[in-house]
Amino acid sequence: MTVSFPPPSTSEPSREEQARALCLRLLTARSRTRAELAGQLAKRGYPEDVGDRVLDRLTAVGLVDDADFAADWVQSRRANAGKSRRALAAELQAKGVDQDVIGTALAGLDAGAERGRAEQLVRTKLRREKLTEDDARVTRRLVAMLARRGYSQTVACEVVIAELAAERDRRRV
């Protein structure tokens, strides 16, 4: 007596197809780094070799590109959130971007523009502040805001003191 086995079902997608579909679904929301996608695949229990094959294919067709991601991330976070070089580097590192790619993405930023962005952020906040004789509270809040965005203590203090004096002069006129 011979036992026959039915042919493998073609309606059930393979693990590789499922992993590819997951990656494509994640990429429709926003671009992601290779490390982020690998982490999501591992979190959902896909074997590492399946994840590597899927990610290699997505990289080959240009859907996953850490250099493009880093450049876009730096441009977006710099313009919208006012982040400093240090904060941007930390964010990219947390997303699994390689140090060389981070360095390349941040190479176009200069210190003068960073200080200018800090001044702009402080000016915007100061317009809404009610200034009193005691500047300590306002100064503390503004320095903390810049620190949260990754600016150094020195730059934050210098910018806040200068902009606070300029705002006081502006309001006197």
Curated annotation (Swiss-Prot):
InterPro entries in UniProt: RecX_HTH_1st, RecX_HTH_2nd, Regulatory_RecX, WH-like_DNA-bd_sf
Tell me, what is an example of a GO biological process annotation in this record? regulation of DNA repair
UniProt keyword terms in alphabetical order: Cytoplasm
GO cellular component, alphabetical, reads: cytoplasm
Query: What domain of life is recorded for the organism?
Result: Bacteria
Its chief place of residence is cytoplasm
Q: Name one Pfam family in it.
A: RecX_HTH1
Respond yes or no to whether keyword Cytoplasm is given for this record. Answer: yes
Gene3D superfamilies to which the protein is assigned, alphabetical: Winged helix-like DNA-binding domain superfamily/Winged helix DNA-binding domain
Q: Which cellular compartments is it found in?
A: Cytoplasm
NCBIfam families, alphabetically? Answer: PRK00117.3-1
Q: Belongs to which family?
A: Belongs to the RecX family.
Under PANTHER family, the record lists: REGULATORY PROTEIN RECX FAMILY PROTEIN
Q: What does this protein do?
A: Modulates RecA activity.
Record's protein name: Regulatory protein RecX
Natural source organism: Mycobacterium marinum (strain ATCC BAA-535 / M)
Q: Which gene encodes it?
A: recX
